[in-house]
Amino acid sequence: MGLVDGYDTSSDSDLNFDEGKSVHEKKNGNLHEDTSYEPSSNNIHKRKSHFTKSELKRRRKTRKGDGPWGSWSSSDDETSQASETQKEDQDIFVHALAEDNLDSEQIEVEEVSHFYGKSEKDYQGRGYLYPPNDVDVDLREERISFRCYLPKKVIRNYPGHPEGTTALKFLPKTGHLILSGGNDHTIKIWDFYHDYECLRDFQGHNKPIKALRFTEDCQSFLSSSFDRSVKIWDTETGKVKTRLHLNSTPADVESRPTNPHEFIVGLSNSKILHYDDRVSENQGLVQTYDHHLSSILALKYFPDGSKFISSSEDKTVRIWENQINVPIKQISDTAQHSMPFLNVHPSQNYFCAQSMDNRIYSFSLKPKYKRHPKKIFKGHSSAGYGISLAFSGDGRYICSGDSKSRLFTWDWNTSRLLNNIKIPGNKPITQVDWHPQETSKVICSGAAGKIYVCD
Protein backbone atom coordinates (compact mmCIF):
# COMPACT_ATOMS: atom_id res chain seq x y z
CA MET A 1 0.00 0.00 0.00
CA GLY A 2 1.33 3.41 -0.89
CA LEU A 3 2.42 6.02 1.56
CA VAL A 4 -0.39 8.34 0.53
CA ASP A 5 -3.14 5.81 1.24
CA GLY A 6 -1.61 4.69 4.52
CA TYR A 7 0.36 1.69 5.60
CA ASP A 8 -0.10 -1.59 7.35
CA THR A 9 1.76 -1.82 10.63
CA SER A 10 2.28 -5.55 10.30
CA SER A 11 4.09 -5.35 6.95
CA ASP A 12 5.74 -1.96 7.18
CA SER A 13 9.09 -3.18 8.41
CA ASP A 14 9.22 -5.93 5.78
CA LEU A 15 8.37 -3.57 2.95
CA ASN A 16 10.91 -1.02 4.06
CA PHE A 17 13.56 -3.68 4.42
CA ASP A 18 12.85 -5.14 0.94
CA GLU A 19 12.78 -1.69 -0.63
CA GLY A 20 16.04 -0.82 0.97
CA LYS A 21 17.55 -4.09 -0.20
CA SER A 22 16.36 -3.70 -3.81
CA VAL A 23 17.67 -0.19 -4.01
CA HIS A 24 21.01 -1.36 -2.64
CA GLU A 25 21.20 -4.18 -5.17
CA LYS A 26 20.27 -1.88 -8.07
CA LYS A 27 23.02 0.53 -7.15
CA ASN A 28 25.66 -2.18 -6.94
CA GLY A 29 24.61 -4.20 -10.03
CA ASN A 30 24.77 -7.98 -9.67
CA LEU A 31 27.47 -8.03 -7.01
CA HIS A 32 25.05 -9.11 -4.28
CA GLU A 33 22.61 -11.21 -6.25
CA ASP A 34 23.93 -14.58 -4.99
CA THR A 35 24.98 -13.47 -1.52
CA SER A 36 22.66 -13.11 1.42
CA TYR A 37 22.23 -9.62 2.87
CA GLU A 38 24.02 -9.16 6.17
CA PRO A 39 23.63 -5.77 7.79
CA SER A 40 26.91 -4.20 8.96
CA SER A 41 27.76 -3.88 12.60
CA ASN A 42 27.63 -0.07 12.29
CA ASN A 43 23.90 -0.22 11.71
CA ILE A 44 23.24 -2.21 14.87
CA HIS A 45 23.08 -0.05 17.99
CA LYS A 46 23.91 -2.04 21.04
CA ARG A 47 22.38 -0.88 24.28
CA LYS A 48 25.01 0.40 26.72
CA SER A 49 25.04 -1.30 30.08
CA HIS A 50 24.69 0.93 33.12
CA PHE A 51 26.08 -0.16 36.46
CA THR A 52 25.79 1.28 39.89
CA LYS A 53 28.90 2.36 41.81
CA SER A 54 28.82 -0.78 43.94
CA GLU A 55 28.55 -3.01 40.85
CA LEU A 56 31.47 -1.23 39.17
CA LYS A 57 33.55 -1.65 42.30
CA ARG A 58 32.70 -5.38 42.37
CA ARG A 59 33.66 -5.78 38.69
CA ARG A 60 36.99 -4.05 39.24
CA LYS A 61 37.79 -6.42 42.07
CA THR A 62 37.28 -9.47 39.80
CA ARG A 63 39.76 -8.24 37.20
CA LYS A 64 43.13 -9.94 37.14
CA GLY A 65 46.51 -8.37 36.59
CA ASP A 66 48.99 -6.04 38.20
CA GLY A 67 48.12 -2.98 36.10
CA PRO A 68 46.15 0.05 37.20
CA TRP A 69 42.91 -1.79 36.36
CA GLY A 70 43.88 -4.99 38.14
CA SER A 71 42.11 -6.55 41.08
CA TRP A 72 42.27 -4.97 44.51
CA SER A 73 43.81 -6.84 47.33
CA SER A 74 42.10 -7.00 50.66
CA SER A 75 44.93 -5.02 52.26
CA ASP A 76 44.55 -2.23 49.68
CA ASP A 77 40.82 -2.16 50.33
CA GLU A 78 41.37 -1.86 54.05
CA THR A 79 43.98 0.85 53.50
CA SER A 80 41.63 2.89 51.31
CA GLN A 81 38.83 2.56 53.84
CA ALA A 82 41.19 3.62 56.61
CA SER A 83 42.39 6.60 54.58
CA GLU A 84 38.81 7.66 53.89
CA THR A 85 37.99 7.42 57.59
CA GLN A 86 41.14 9.37 58.45
CA LYS A 87 40.23 12.08 55.93
CA GLU A 88 36.74 12.41 57.39
CA ASP A 89 38.19 12.69 60.90
CA GLN A 90 40.68 15.29 59.66
CA ASP A 91 37.91 17.36 58.05
CA ILE A 92 35.94 17.24 61.29
CA PHE A 93 39.05 18.31 63.25
CA VAL A 94 39.80 21.21 60.89
CA HIS A 95 36.20 22.38 61.08
CA ALA A 96 36.24 22.20 64.87
CA LEU A 97 39.58 24.04 64.96
CA ALA A 98 38.15 26.81 62.79
CA GLU A 99 35.21 27.14 65.16
CA ASP A 100 37.58 27.27 68.12
CA ASN A 101 39.61 30.03 66.45
CA LEU A 102 36.43 31.96 65.75
CA ASP A 103 35.33 31.59 69.34
CA SER A 104 38.76 32.56 70.66
CA GLU A 105 38.49 35.94 68.95
CA GLN A 106 35.30 36.60 70.91
CA ILE A 107 36.76 35.51 74.26
CA GLU A 108 36.99 38.37 76.70
CA VAL A 109 40.59 39.31 77.44
CA GLU A 110 41.43 40.27 80.99
CA GLU A 111 41.38 44.06 81.13
CA VAL A 112 43.94 45.35 83.59
CA SER A 113 45.86 48.57 84.08
CA HIS A 114 48.92 49.21 86.23
CA PHE A 115 50.17 52.55 87.51
CA TYR A 116 53.97 52.97 87.64
CA GLY A 117 54.33 56.60 88.74
CA LYS A 118 55.09 57.92 92.20
CA SER A 119 51.50 58.82 93.11
CA GLU A 120 48.21 58.81 91.22
CA LYS A 121 47.04 62.07 92.87
CA ASP A 122 48.85 65.21 93.91
CA TYR A 123 48.34 67.02 97.22
CA GLN A 124 45.18 68.63 95.84
CA GLY A 125 43.72 65.35 94.61
CA ARG A 126 44.42 65.97 90.91
CA GLY A 127 45.49 63.18 88.59
CA TYR A 128 48.15 63.18 85.88
CA LEU A 129 45.75 64.68 83.32
CA TYR A 130 46.13 68.03 85.07
CA PRO A 131 48.99 69.92 83.35
CA PRO A 132 52.07 70.49 85.55
CA ASN A 133 53.00 73.97 86.71
CA ASP A 134 56.72 73.34 87.27
CA VAL A 135 57.74 73.39 83.59
CA ASP A 136 59.08 76.26 81.50
CA VAL A 137 56.19 76.18 79.03
CA ASP A 138 52.69 77.55 79.56
CA LEU A 139 50.66 74.47 78.67
CA ARG A 140 47.35 76.36 78.72
CA GLU A 141 48.27 78.74 75.91
CA GLU A 142 46.33 78.83 72.66
CA ARG A 143 47.87 76.58 70.04
CA ILE A 144 48.52 79.16 67.31
CA SER A 145 49.62 82.05 69.54
CA PHE A 146 53.35 81.30 69.17
CA ARG A 147 55.85 80.73 66.37
CA CYS A 148 57.36 77.30 65.74
CA TYR A 149 60.83 76.36 64.51
CA LEU A 150 62.49 73.41 62.83
CA PRO A 151 63.56 70.36 64.84
CA LYS A 152 67.28 69.72 64.33
CA LYS A 153 68.31 66.52 66.14
CA VAL A 154 67.25 63.64 68.39
CA ILE A 155 67.52 64.66 72.05
CA ARG A 156 66.20 61.57 73.90
CA ASN A 157 64.15 58.42 73.54
CA TYR A 158 61.64 56.26 75.39
CA PRO A 159 61.70 52.44 75.49
CA GLY A 160 58.38 52.34 73.65
CA HIS A 161 57.27 48.88 72.54
CA PRO A 162 59.99 46.27 71.83
CA GLU A 163 58.14 44.64 68.93
CA GLY A 164 57.28 47.92 67.21
CA THR A 165 55.14 50.98 67.89
CA THR A 166 51.95 51.20 65.82
CA ALA A 167 50.20 54.26 67.31
CA LEU A 168 51.56 57.46 68.87
CA LYS A 169 49.78 60.61 70.09
CA PHE A 170 50.45 63.64 72.26
CA LEU A 171 47.78 64.56 74.76
CA PRO A 172 45.77 67.24 72.89
CA LYS A 173 46.05 70.90 73.95
CA THR A 174 48.74 70.40 76.64
CA GLY A 175 51.07 67.67 75.36
CA HIS A 176 52.49 66.73 78.77
CA LEU A 177 51.61 63.05 78.19
CA ILE A 178 52.30 60.64 75.32
CA LEU A 179 49.93 57.82 74.40
CA SER A 180 51.40 54.86 72.51
CA GLY A 181 50.36 51.40 71.37
CA GLY A 182 52.35 48.59 69.84
CA ASN A 183 52.66 45.07 68.55
CA ASP A 184 52.98 43.82 72.13
CA HIS A 185 49.18 44.29 72.50
CA THR A 186 49.78 46.98 75.14
CA ILE A 187 48.88 50.67 75.42
CA LYS A 188 51.10 52.97 77.49
CA ILE A 189 51.06 56.55 78.78
CA TRP A 190 54.43 58.29 79.17
CA ASP A 191 55.50 61.37 81.10
CA PHE A 192 56.97 63.94 78.71
CA TYR A 193 58.52 66.42 81.15
CA HIS A 194 59.73 64.93 84.43
CA ASP A 195 61.07 61.39 84.69
CA TYR A 196 60.41 60.38 81.06
CA GLU A 197 58.92 57.11 82.27
CA CYS A 198 55.81 55.04 81.70
CA LEU A 199 53.06 56.20 84.04
CA ARG A 200 50.39 53.61 83.23
CA ASP A 201 49.80 50.69 80.91
CA PHE A 202 46.49 49.36 79.57
CA GLN A 203 46.15 45.65 78.78
CA GLY A 204 42.94 44.44 77.20
CA HIS A 205 43.70 43.43 73.63
CA ASN A 206 45.13 40.09 72.52
CA LYS A 207 46.50 41.30 69.18
CA PRO A 208 48.54 44.35 68.03
CA ILE A 209 47.09 47.82 68.46
CA LYS A 210 45.91 49.45 65.23
CA ALA A 211 44.87 53.00 66.19
CA LEU A 212 44.48 55.30 69.20
CA ARG A 213 42.45 58.51 69.54
CA PHE A 214 41.73 60.84 72.45
CA THR A 215 38.28 62.27 72.95
CA GLU A 216 38.06 66.05 72.94
CA ASP A 217 38.00 66.35 76.74
CA CYS A 218 40.90 63.84 77.04
CA GLN A 219 39.10 62.01 79.84
CA SER A 220 38.87 58.95 77.58
CA PHE A 221 40.60 57.48 74.56
CA LEU A 222 39.63 54.92 71.93
CA SER A 223 41.71 51.94 70.90
CA SER A 224 41.27 49.55 67.98
CA SER A 225 43.11 46.29 67.52
CA PHE A 226 43.59 43.42 65.10
CA ASP A 227 41.53 41.30 67.52
CA ARG A 228 38.48 42.99 65.92
CA SER A 229 37.57 44.98 68.99
CA VAL A 230 37.25 48.67 69.84
CA LYS A 231 37.46 49.83 73.44
CA ILE A 232 37.00 53.14 75.21
CA TRP A 233 39.30 53.54 78.22
CA ASP A 234 39.28 55.97 81.11
CA THR A 235 42.58 57.83 80.73
CA GLU A 236 43.29 58.19 84.46
CA THR A 237 41.90 55.01 86.01
CA GLY A 238 42.48 52.54 83.16
CA LYS A 239 38.94 51.14 83.32
CA VAL A 240 37.11 50.16 80.14
CA LYS A 241 33.95 52.21 79.63
CA THR A 242 32.76 50.66 76.36
CA ARG A 243 33.78 47.59 74.37
CA LEU A 244 32.72 46.59 70.86
CA HIS A 245 33.28 43.24 69.15
CA LEU A 246 33.14 43.60 65.37
CA ASN A 247 33.07 41.16 62.45
CA SER A 248 35.98 42.86 60.70
CA THR A 249 39.29 44.47 61.64
CA PRO A 250 38.88 48.13 62.70
CA ALA A 251 41.51 49.96 60.66
CA ASP A 252 40.95 53.40 62.20
CA VAL A 253 38.83 55.14 64.82
CA GLU A 254 37.99 58.80 65.22
CA SER A 255 36.16 60.71 67.95
CA ARG A 256 33.80 63.53 66.99
CA PRO A 257 35.31 66.86 68.13
CA THR A 258 32.10 68.52 69.31
CA ASN A 259 30.60 65.45 70.97
CA PRO A 260 32.79 63.05 72.97
CA HIS A 261 29.99 60.44 73.00
CA GLU A 262 30.11 59.87 69.23
CA PHE A 263 32.84 58.13 67.26
CA ILE A 264 33.32 56.42 63.91
CA VAL A 265 35.12 53.17 63.09
CA GLY A 266 36.54 52.29 59.67
CA LEU A 267 36.60 48.56 58.93
CA SER A 268 38.59 46.38 56.57
CA ASN A 269 35.33 45.22 54.94
CA SER A 270 34.88 48.71 53.39
CA LYS A 271 32.24 49.91 55.88
CA ILE A 272 32.32 52.84 58.30
CA LEU A 273 30.29 52.49 61.50
CA HIS A 274 28.99 55.49 63.46
CA TYR A 275 28.43 54.91 67.19
CA ASP A 276 26.92 56.86 70.06
CA ASP A 277 27.69 55.39 73.48
CA ARG A 278 24.50 56.94 74.89
CA VAL A 279 22.37 54.62 72.72
CA SER A 280 21.73 51.19 74.20
CA GLU A 281 20.26 49.43 71.15
CA ASN A 282 22.55 47.62 68.70
CA GLN A 283 25.69 48.45 70.73
CA GLY A 284 25.08 52.14 70.07
CA LEU A 285 25.30 51.88 66.27
CA VAL A 286 23.42 54.81 64.71
CA GLN A 287 24.61 54.75 61.08
CA THR A 288 26.55 52.63 58.57
CA TYR A 289 28.38 54.20 55.63
CA ASP A 290 28.98 51.62 52.89
CA HIS A 291 29.90 53.37 49.63
CA HIS A 292 33.60 52.49 49.66
CA LEU A 293 34.66 49.46 47.63
CA SER A 294 37.65 48.28 49.67
CA SER A 295 39.23 48.48 53.12
CA ILE A 296 39.07 51.76 55.00
CA LEU A 297 42.53 53.22 55.63
CA ALA A 298 42.03 56.51 57.48
CA LEU A 299 39.33 58.72 58.99
CA LYS A 300 39.41 62.38 60.01
CA TYR A 301 36.75 64.79 61.26
CA PHE A 302 36.44 68.41 60.21
CA PRO A 303 37.47 70.75 63.08
CA ASP A 304 33.83 71.67 63.76
CA GLY A 305 32.70 68.02 63.66
CA SER A 306 30.07 68.66 60.98
CA LYS A 307 31.62 66.32 58.41
CA PHE A 308 34.33 63.71 58.19
CA ILE A 309 36.80 62.45 55.59
CA SER A 310 37.52 58.83 54.74
CA SER A 311 40.25 57.21 52.68
CA SER A 312 40.16 53.69 51.31
CA GLU A 313 42.17 51.11 49.40
CA ASP A 314 39.80 51.70 46.47
CA LYS A 315 42.00 54.79 45.85
CA THR A 316 39.26 57.29 46.63
CA VAL A 317 38.77 59.93 49.32
CA ARG A 318 35.18 60.69 50.31
CA ILE A 319 33.59 63.39 52.43
CA TRP A 320 30.45 62.63 54.42
CA GLU A 321 27.79 64.44 56.40
CA ASN A 322 27.16 62.95 59.82
CA GLN A 323 24.60 60.13 59.83
CA ILE A 324 23.87 60.40 56.08
CA ASN A 325 24.91 57.37 54.06
CA VAL A 326 25.61 59.33 50.87
CA PRO A 327 29.01 61.01 50.39
CA ILE A 328 28.79 64.66 49.44
CA LYS A 329 32.10 64.44 47.59
CA GLN A 330 34.22 61.69 46.05
CA ILE A 331 37.82 62.59 45.23
CA SER A 332 39.26 60.17 42.69
CA ASP A 333 41.52 60.15 39.67
CA THR A 334 42.93 57.55 37.32
CA ALA A 335 46.45 58.34 38.54
CA GLN A 336 45.51 58.58 42.23
CA HIS A 337 47.08 56.16 44.71
CA SER A 338 45.88 54.88 48.06
CA MET A 339 46.18 57.41 50.89
CA PRO A 340 46.78 55.72 54.26
CA PHE A 341 46.82 58.83 56.48
CA LEU A 342 44.84 62.08 56.75
CA ASN A 343 45.37 65.21 58.83
CA VAL A 344 43.77 68.66 58.98
CA HIS A 345 45.73 71.92 58.97
CA PRO A 346 45.40 73.71 62.36
CA SER A 347 44.69 77.20 61.02
CA GLN A 348 43.82 77.02 57.30
CA ASN A 349 40.99 75.30 55.47
CA TYR A 350 43.04 72.42 54.11
CA PHE A 351 43.57 68.78 54.85
CA CYS A 352 46.54 66.69 53.73
CA ALA A 353 46.76 63.07 52.66
CA GLN A 354 49.83 60.86 52.65
CA SER A 355 49.93 59.08 49.29
CA MET A 356 51.53 55.80 48.27
CA ASP A 357 53.37 57.53 45.40
CA ASN A 358 55.82 59.23 47.82
CA ARG A 359 53.90 62.50 47.95
CA ILE A 360 51.68 64.45 50.32
CA TYR A 361 48.69 66.12 48.65
CA SER A 362 46.61 69.03 49.95
CA PHE A 363 42.84 69.43 49.52
CA SER A 364 40.47 72.25 50.34
CA LEU A 365 38.02 71.90 53.23
CA LYS A 366 35.54 74.16 51.44
CA PRO A 367 32.89 72.92 48.98
CA LYS A 368 34.22 71.41 45.76
CA TYR A 369 37.07 70.13 47.96
CA LYS A 370 39.60 70.48 45.17
CA ARG A 371 43.20 69.41 45.33
CA HIS A 372 45.67 72.28 45.55
CA PRO A 373 47.94 72.00 42.47
CA LYS A 374 50.99 73.61 44.13
CA LYS A 375 50.87 72.31 47.70
CA ILE A 376 52.49 68.95 46.99
CA PHE A 377 55.22 67.80 49.36
CA LYS A 378 57.75 65.27 48.11
CA GLY A 379 61.28 64.01 48.68
CA HIS A 380 60.54 61.25 51.18
CA SER A 381 59.79 57.56 50.60
CA SER A 382 56.38 56.41 51.83
CA ALA A 383 55.29 53.80 49.28
CA GLY A 384 54.17 50.57 50.87
CA TYR A 385 53.81 51.93 54.42
CA GLY A 386 51.06 53.70 56.34
CA ILE A 387 53.19 56.68 57.36
CA SER A 388 51.65 59.50 59.35
CA LEU A 389 52.17 63.26 59.07
CA ALA A 390 51.80 66.16 61.49
CA PHE A 391 51.57 69.97 61.50
CA SER A 392 53.38 72.41 63.73
CA GLY A 393 51.28 74.31 66.23
CA ASP A 394 51.25 77.50 64.16
CA GLY A 395 50.75 75.65 60.86
CA ARG A 396 54.01 76.84 59.28
CA TYR A 397 55.55 73.39 58.94
CA ILE A 398 54.45 69.93 57.98
CA CYS A 399 56.49 66.85 58.91
CA SER A 400 56.35 63.20 57.95
CA GLY A 401 58.10 59.93 58.61
CA ASP A 402 59.89 57.88 55.99
CA SER A 403 60.46 54.24 55.08
CA LYS A 404 64.24 54.79 55.38
CA SER A 405 64.21 55.88 59.03
CA ARG A 406 64.13 59.65 58.46
CA LEU A 407 62.01 62.58 59.63
CA PHE A 408 61.22 65.17 56.93
CA THR A 409 60.01 68.75 57.41
CA TRP A 410 58.60 71.07 54.70
CA ASP A 411 57.54 74.69 54.60
CA TRP A 412 53.74 74.84 54.32
CA ASN A 413 53.60 78.02 52.23
CA THR A 414 56.30 77.21 49.68
CA SER A 415 56.20 73.35 49.74
CA ARG A 416 60.00 73.43 49.97
CA LEU A 417 61.83 70.64 51.80
CA LEU A 418 63.68 72.24 54.72
CA ASN A 419 65.48 69.37 56.45
CA ASN A 420 65.47 65.68 57.28
CA ILE A 421 66.76 63.99 60.42
CA LYS A 422 68.20 60.50 60.45
CA ILE A 423 66.51 58.46 63.19
CA PRO A 424 68.38 55.53 64.81
CA GLY A 425 67.13 52.03 64.16
CA ASN A 426 67.23 51.87 60.35
CA LYS A 427 63.57 50.91 60.21
CA PRO A 428 60.54 52.78 58.82
CA ILE A 429 59.30 55.74 60.85
CA THR A 430 55.52 55.38 60.64
CA GLN A 431 54.32 57.47 63.62
CA VAL A 432 54.88 61.23 63.94
CA ASP A 433 53.29 63.92 66.11
CA TRP A 434 54.21 67.57 66.81
CA HIS A 435 53.94 68.88 70.36
CA PRO A 436 50.85 71.14 70.64
CA GLN A 437 52.58 73.66 72.96
CA GLU A 438 56.32 73.35 72.26
CA THR A 439 57.81 75.30 69.36
CA SER A 440 60.00 72.58 67.87
CA LYS A 441 59.54 69.24 69.67
CA VAL A 442 58.43 66.27 67.57
CA ILE A 443 58.02 62.64 68.60
CA CYS A 444 58.38 59.77 66.15
CA SER A 445 58.55 56.00 66.20
CA GLY A 446 58.02 52.94 64.05
CA ALA A 447 59.02 49.34 63.54
CA ALA A 448 62.09 49.71 65.78
CA GLY A 449 59.81 50.30 68.77
CA LYS A 450 61.62 53.13 70.55
CA ILE A 451 59.99 56.57 70.74
CA TYR A 452 62.37 59.40 69.76
CA VAL A 453 62.05 63.07 70.66
CA CYS A 454 63.49 65.59 68.19
CA ASP A 455 64.13 69.26 68.92
Curated annotation (Swiss-Prot):
Skewed-composition ranges (Basic and acidic residues): 18-35
Its GO CC terms are: catalytic step 2 spliceosome; nuclear periphery; Prp19 complex; spliceosomal complex
- Positions of disulphide bridges: none
Output the CDD domains linked to this UniProt entry. Answer: WD40 (cd00200)
Single Gene Ontology MF annotation: mRNA binding
A Gene Ontology biological process annotation? mRNA splicing, via spliceosome
Report the locations given in the UniProt record.
Answer: Nucleus
Q: Where are the WD repeats?
A: 160-200, 204-243, 291-330, 334-373, 379-422, 424-454
Q: Where is this region: Disordered?
A: 1-89
* Superkingdom of origin organism: Eukaryota
Keywords, ordered alphabetically: mRNA processing, mRNA splicing, Nucleus, Repeat, Spliceosome, WD repeat
Q: Where is the composition biased (Basic residues)?
A: 44-63
Q: What is its main location?
A: nucleus
Under the subunit heading, UniProt states: Belongs to the CWC complex (or CEF1-associated complex), a spliceosome sub-complex reminiscent of a late-stage spliceosome composed of the U2, U5 and U6 snRNAs and at least BUD13, BUD31, BRR2, CDC40, CEF1, CLF1, CUS1, CWC2, CWC15, CWC21, CWC22, CWC23, CWC24, CWC25, CWC27, ECM2, HSH155, IST3, ISY1, LEA1, MSL1, NTC20, PRP8, PRP9, PRP11, PRP19, PRP21, PRP22, PRP45, PRP46, SLU7, SMB1, SMD1, SMD2, SMD3, SMX2, SMX3, SNT309, SNU114, SPP2, SYF1, SYF2, RSE1 and YJU2.
Entry function = May function in the second step of pre-mRNA splicing. Regulatory protein involved in replication and mitotic spindle formation and/or maintenance. Required for initiation and completion of S-phase and for initiation and completion of DNA replication. Might be required for the maintenance of microtubules. Essential only at elevated temperatures.
Its UniProt miscellaneous note says: Present with 1630 molecules/cell in log phase SD medium.
Protein name, UniProt field: Pre-mRNA-processing factor 17
Q: Source species, please?
A: Saccharomyces cerevisiae (strain ATCC 204508 / S288c)
* GN (gene name): CDC40
